[in-house]
Amino acid sequence: PERLRFTFNTLRFTSMDEVEEFKPELVINAVTVKYTIPAFEEVMPHLPEDCIISDISSVKTGLKDFYSRCGHRYVSTHPMFGPTFANLNQLSHENAIIINEGDYMGRIFFKDLYNRLGLSIYEYSFEEHDKTVAYSLSIPFVSTFVFAAVMKHQDAPGTTFKRHMKIARGVLSEDDYLLQEIL
């Protein structure tokens, strides 16, 4: 296993043998939404029975059904900030959602973690989460795409225009898969 930079007490495994040998109590799946369930299916045969599996996916579609039949305890969360605009030194202005349908101890772990980071925590069902994401992520992303598509270069832009353009550039620089998943 290789130690990860900037992350304490975290190891990166490159083979399933390393996972089996380590016997994790909690696995956090942080792949893109498209690969969340396949990644779980690949690693689960190598996990102890009592291991809690966890995702931090921005879209929860299909996960509730998967979790109900997977045979593992689970916890599902969504840090509501990303690499484009979040200030990792000032997370007290950011939010996280914890799905209230998962394992109690898993939820306590993430509540503690997110509290230590200073995040505002909200608890929603899978369905409530996806409605919130549709409203708070999808609509702003789509409106930003429309803004970027119809705007032309301004020699003397106003403050609001400059801020909108900065946001548009940031959103358009996101990973294509992330944008596809959110939309």
Predicted features by range, described:
Residues 1-6, 12:
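NAD(P)-binding Rossmann-fold cofactor-contacting core
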Residues 11-17, 122-125:
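Short acidic-hydrophobic, aromatic-tinged amphipathic segments that line or gate anion-handling sites
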Residues 18-46:
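Rossmann-like NAD(P)-binding element
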Residues 28-29, 54, 98:
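Redox-cofactor binding/interface segments in oxidoreductases and associated redox assembly factors
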Residues 44-49, 90-91:
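Short, conserved loop/helix-junction motifs that constitute active-site signature segments
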Residues 47-63:
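ADP-ribose/adenylate-binding Rossmann-like module
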Residues 59, 63-124:
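Rossmann-fold dinucleotide-binding core
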Residues 123-183:
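An accessory alpha-helical subdomain
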